[in-house]
A protein has these predicted regions:
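Signature of N-terminal electron-transfer/Fe-S-associated modules in redox systems
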Residues: 1-161
Length: 161
């Protein structure tokens, strides 16, 4: 057993966990943050994507000890109260989801993509960057449309700050 301390969605967290505990299981089983989904446990599907220190990471392949001291953000931590994050709003407005299982991971990956590419983001880049996120329901068209729409919203919001 090890004690880990990290910040999750802006709150300090300390947990005693087995050394083999994956971050996704700490989030879901110990902290009840069930928006982060377990799809494959092999880093293939992207349903478990969270941000560690601002970068998208598949939490099913990160040991909790590797995140010790880190700042972790989950899908539950990106909205501001009842106000959706621009990426969440764009997915809603552009019908970027169907069953919703992949959506939290898609949104977390997409936020990271927009943060890295800014106004240089185009459709080909979005499609390439989302290759690690699998959706079984959609043809990805509305997901890509959502990401590009959100990129505009996020860039406008950042410029206003």
């Amino acid at each position: 057993m090890s004690t880990v301390k990290l910040t999750v969605n802006g709150k300090s967290v300390s947990a005693d966990v087995e050394d083999r505990t994956l971050l996704v299981h700490l989030l879901r089983d110990h902290l009840n943050l069930t928006g982060t989904h377990v799809g494959c446990d092999t880093s293939q599907c992207g349903a478990c994507v969270v941000h560690i220190d601002g970068r998208a990471v598949k939490s099913c392949t990160v040991l909790v000890g590797q995140a010790d001291g880190a700042n972790v953000t989950t899908i539950e931590g990106i909205s501001k109260g009842d106000v959706l994050h621009p990426m969440q709003a764009a997915f809603r407005d552009n019908h970027g989801l169907q069953c919703g299982y992949c959506t939290p991971g898609m949104i977390m990956s997409a936020i990271d993509i927009v943060n890295r590419y800014g106004d240089k983001l185009d459709e080909d880049t979005v499609r390439h960057e989302l290759e690690g996120n699998i959706c079984r329901c959609t043809g990805y068209h509305n997901i890509v449309k959502s990401v590009l729409d959100a990129a505009g919203r996020m860039n406008v919001a950042q410029a206003a700050e």
